[in-house]
Design a protein with these regions (language model features):
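Bacterial N-terminal signal peptides
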Residues: 14-23
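N-terminal hydrophobic or amphipathic helices and topogenic motifs
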Residues: 27-108, 292-329
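Bilobed "Venus flytrap"/periplasmic-binding protein-like clamshell domains
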Residues: 68-91, 126, 149-217, 224-226, ...
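Periplasmic-binding protein-like
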Residues: 71-72, 146-155, 182-184, 242-314
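Short beta-strand-to-loop elements that line the ligand-binding cleft
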Residues: 97-104, 202-211, 249-252
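Acidic, polar ligand-binding/catalytic clefts
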Residues: 111-169
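Ligand-binding "clamshell"
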Residues: 131-143, 237-251
């Protein structure tokens, strides 16, 4: 398989966050205001689909220690060292201590920001709208190239020795989706494949593997007949030697989707937000472990949720997704 490349602490704090009674947060629900699909904790008076900064300046957060977490798509332990050059840069620019937390689930990550214990986060594509609507996350950056290109594709793989040559051949097969909220691993296939003549759950059996890497390794081991996965994930897996590209066959690839969004909490002090954005947009990937891990990425590029996540919201709407804590798994 050959496709173009693109792109420390214990979990005790985030675990505690996920257990924080939501009743405490509900007590701070905003008075009647325009909020669109946002949770009652937030307002959206300007209609940009993300939470407004609180009008009361006393509610602005200006922590001396910033907590940063990256999406739990793959083995989280790997990323503590990979992200360290950026964490150091973020600390230098903001003048704050910055701590990287490895998270085990999308739900824990969203709950951590919702409760105010997580200040900056990379949320994967599908969970980003949950983070925006449930946790007041404000997406502002993506990884991209110098010419502004960014994103990843949905790729459908099967084992090289299987009898599956096209999507049509998936009928009657056992196909691994990743998780219910994953874009490329579940929602996009459910929205896009029926137009191509194959409907998940009707034409093939869906089983959830739990992650993109487990889906891919399951295809290699022939535990699954096929799997839809994110191109950027399998490319990084191949680069680390986690599977042999010659063991799989690519039978479908979609157009590009936005990749992991980088967000700050809606209630951060505007001066701090300015420094956070400066840190992201001045970080040099060249010669760092982060640059090596995300091959083809050269910088962070500015984005806005309303525009760049429109295709994802459309896919989720087609799947009747509701942005509730119960649906975030």
């Amino acid at each position: 398989m050959k496709t173009p490349s693109w792109p420390k602490r214990p979990l005790a704090l985030l675990t505690a966050v996920s257990l924080l009674p939501m009743a405490l947060l509900a007590s701070h629900a905003q008075a009647d205001c325009e909020r669109g699909a946002l949770d009652a904790l937030y307002c959206d008076e300007n209609g940009d689909m993300v939470a407004d900064r609180p009008a009361d300046e006393s509610s602005w957060a200006n922590p001396s220690t910033l907590i940063f977490a990256y999406t739990p798509v793959e083995d989280p332990a790997i990323y503590s060292d990979i992200w360290q050059p950026f964490v150091d840069h973020l600390s230098e620019v903001t003048g704050r201590d910055v701590r990287f937390f490895a998270v085990q689930s999308n739900a824990a990550q969203v709950e951590a920001m919702r409760s105010g214990r997580l200040h900056i986060a990379g949320f994967s594509t599908g969970p980003t709208p949950f983070a925006v609507n449930l946790a007041g996350a404000v997406p502002f950056a993506l990884m991209g190239s110098d010419d502004g290109q960014f994103g990843y594709t949905l790729q459908m793989f099967t084992h090289v020795d299987s009898d599956i040559e096209s999507l049509e051949d998936l009928k009657g097969k056992r196909v691994a989706h990743t998780s219910p909220t994953s874009n490329s691993g579940n929602l996009a296939p459910r929205a896009l494949l029926p137009e191509l003549g194959i409907t998940p759950d009707e034409d093939y059996e869906v089983v959830y593997s739990g992650s993109h890497d487990q889906s891919m390794l399951g295809v290699v081991a022939r535990d699954y007949d096929a799997a839809p996965v994110a191109s950027e994930v399998v490319e990084r897996m191949a680069a680390r030697g986690l599977y042999d590209e010659e063991d799989v066959r690519l039978i479908y690839e979609s157009d590009r989707f936005p990749t992991t969004s980088y967000n700050y909490a809606h209630n951060l002090h505007p001066d701090l937000v300015e420094k956070i954005e400066e840190a992201f947009f001045t970080f040099d990937f060249v010669g760092t472990e982060l640059g090596e891990e995300f091959e083809g990425v050269e910088k962070f590029i500015p984005i806005n949720y309303q525009e760049h996540w429109q295709v994802i919201r459309t896919i989720q709407a087609a799947n009747d997704v509701r942005y509730t804590r119960e649906n975030l798994e």
